[in-house]
Structures are given as structure tokens and as C-alpha cells.
Amino acid sequence: MTKADLVHEIAAQTGVDKQSVLAVIESMKDQIKNSLQTGENVYLRGFGSFILKKRAAKTARNISKNTTIVIPEHYIPYFKPCKELIETVKG
């Protein structure tokens, strides 16, 4: 399902026009990004959590130059579904 499909389905289900639904989805996406950027996790009860996971520093190889590089410690965004969502998908 694409964002356009999601907008269409929500608009059809709620009776709200597509522009308003798209604005809400974009705003939600921006708020989640902003929260994660500032180090805050986002918890959506009954759906899941958008959290930051720490990746440890590691050594990697650049095979084209045959050199070793150090990738510093960093954080990546991660979605952790709630148990209810996991059970729904499992069937």
C-alpha cells in the first residue's frame, strides 16, 4: 500500500477530503521525524513505537581502496510493533 492508497482509503472510510487526510499524514510524519531527531521516542498505543536504536562503532573495509575506515557510533530509527499488531498480522 502506498501513501496515495492510504489517503484514498482513509478519505473513503471517514468522509474527509483527500487533501485534509494527506495534510494530517504529512504532519504526523513530520512530527515523528522531529521527535526522533531530538532523541524522543514516539509511542502509539495499540499500534507500535518509533524508537532510536544505538549502533555501536565498528571497523569496515573500503575494498576499492583497500583501506580500513571507522564507522562511528550512531542511532537509527526503528519501528517496534505492539503485540496486538503482531498477533493481527500473524492471523
Label each region the model flagged:
Residues M1-G91:
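Strongly charged
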